[in-house]
Amino acid sequence: MKLIIQDGKEEDHLQVLNKQLEIGIDEVGRGAVFGPVFSAAVVLTEKNGYTLKQLGVTDSKKLTEKKRKLLLPKIISLSSDYSLGQSSAREIDQLGIRYATELSMIRAIKKLKSKPYEVIIDGPLSLRLWKSHQRNIIAGDSKFTSIAAASIVAKVTRDFLMERLEKKFSGYFIFKNKGYGTKEHLLSLKANGVTNLHRKSFLTKLNLI
């Protein structure tokens, strides 16, 4: 690959190109008691990041479900690349939520077509198994469009999975609670028991099993 000079250093063209891209990472479902934790990675150019910001891309928690679903195809269309990773309820129970969340992020990063020079991660969770450059940004989904876009991709995708699982796990109100420990959900556990997709490590701490 042809070498070019960047800030007095020789770097290959692909590395310089990757530095011009913003790669945001975010997770969803970390605090749920049912189902996997999802992470998304979204790669944006500065121009397309600005366009998405103008379209209303921000922290997924600040958007309605309808707005998130409307923005998803726009994010996919304008991103240079995007990917998803997840860790199952079983992995969460075996590894702990911190490590399982980190694993889901790394799985998302590894699915990207090219190795990123640097990733920007929402929150304080550093990726111990990722040896490349990374930045942790508190409230990053409100500050970086790529992280905000990743939060929307992860949220819409996980919510869709929860809605599909409602048919198989009826009686737990998964369609409504999306796997989170609402009062209705926790009461249903006493009536219906624990499924193989419930996070038993979480339920143990809540004295539910």
Swiss-Prot record:
What does the record give as EC number?
3.1.26.4
Instruction: Give the UniProt subcellular location, in the record's own words.
Output: Cytoplasm
Q: Its Gene Ontology biological processes?
A: DNA replication, removal of RNA primer; mismatch repair
Coarsely, its chief localization is cytoplasm
Which residues bind a divalent metal cation per the record? 26-27, 122
Cofactor(s) demanded: Mn(2+); Mg(2+)
Which GO cellular component terms, listed alphabetically, does the Swiss-Prot or TrEMBL entry include?
cytoplasm; ribonuclease H2 complex
Textual note on the cofactor: Manganese or magnesium. Binds 1 divalent metal ion per monomer in the absence of substrate. May bind a second metal ion after substrate binding.
Looking at the record, the residues that make up the RNase H type-2 domain are: 20-209
Recorded GO MF terms: manganese ion binding; RNA binding; RNA-DNA hybrid ribonuclease activity
Q: Which CDD domains match?
A: RNase_HII_bacteria_HII_like
Q: Which InterPro entries did the record assign?
A: RNase_HII, RNase_HII/HIII, RNase_HII/HIII_dom, RNaseH-like_sf, RNaseH_sf
The chemistry this enzyme catalyses reads: Endonucleolytic cleavage to 5'-phosphomonoester
Q: Which UniProt keywords apply?
A: Cytoplasm, Endonuclease, Hydrolase, Manganese, Metal-binding, Nuclease
* Entries under NCBIfam families matching the protein: PRK00015.1-3, PRK13925.1
Known role: Endonuclease that specifically degrades the RNA of RNA-DNA hybrids.
Per the similarity annotation, which family is this? Belongs to the RNase HII family.
Q: What is this protein called?
A: Ribonuclease HII
Native species? Prochlorococcus marinus (strain MIT 9515)
